[in-house]
């Protein structure tokens, strides 16, 4: 009599990278939560179903305060999936795990500045510098409401429009050959040289290397125009392309 032996398959372990937003709380926490409420009110659904890491490097906080902060964030629909730069005394059962190896990013700063004058002045001829090519993604269809495009490794080009409620996230620059009505976040891997280009600016939110502006922050003259955005230090600059 033959006996058939069935051996169960071993568990397969795979490695993957996932993109998460990093929040850096500041004291007093009540004031920081008020700013968070303001951002959420001006960009509805921004934190919905999104992994969030809490960076505790620049805040002196004890465990009871941290527990209360997590509860306050949950009430706002913000679920923390991990801590960065947390002291061992803050970790333990019932707390999110410690995260390591994340790329540093600039703090969110909603300051508004007027675009610099575009007056031209004589300049010396620019030197030619060779740079390494970066990966890119090209999306040949419109990005519809509720859809997200994530590409943390380089530039993203959308051959079409980005609808309200849609989202494009890129480690490099973002090019939209249509109307940008949703959210566009460029330079998410700490690339302050990233830019955002669009044929028609109607965005709910734009961000470069963590520095963001909502629709209410942007000048009315930019609405409906072909626009490029970039960073100048801690300020987001904008100019029309027409």
Curated annotation (Swiss-Prot):
Pfam families: MinC_C. The keyword Iron does not apply. The keyword Cell cycle applies. SUPFAM superfamilies: Cell-division inhibitor MinC, C-terminal domain (SSF63848). It comes from the Bacteria. GO terms for biological process: cell morphogenesis; division septum assembly; regulation of cell septum assembly. Keywords: Cell cycle, Cell division, Septation. HAMAP family: MinC (MF_00267). Cell division inhibitor that blocks the formation of polar Z ring septums. Rapidly oscillates between the poles of the cell to destabilize FtsZ filaments that have formed before they mature into polar Z rings. Prevents FtsZ polymerization. Interacts with MinD and FtsZ. Belongs to the MinC family. NCBIfam families: minC. This is Probable septum site-determining protein MinC. It comes from Brucella anthropi (strain ATCC 49188 / DSM 6882 / CCUG 24695 / JCM 21032 / LMG 3331 / NBRC 15819 / NCTC 12168 / Alc 37) (Ochrobactrum anthropi). The lineage of its organism: Bacteria, Pseudomonadati, Pseudomonadota, Alphaproteobacteria, Hyphomicrobiales.
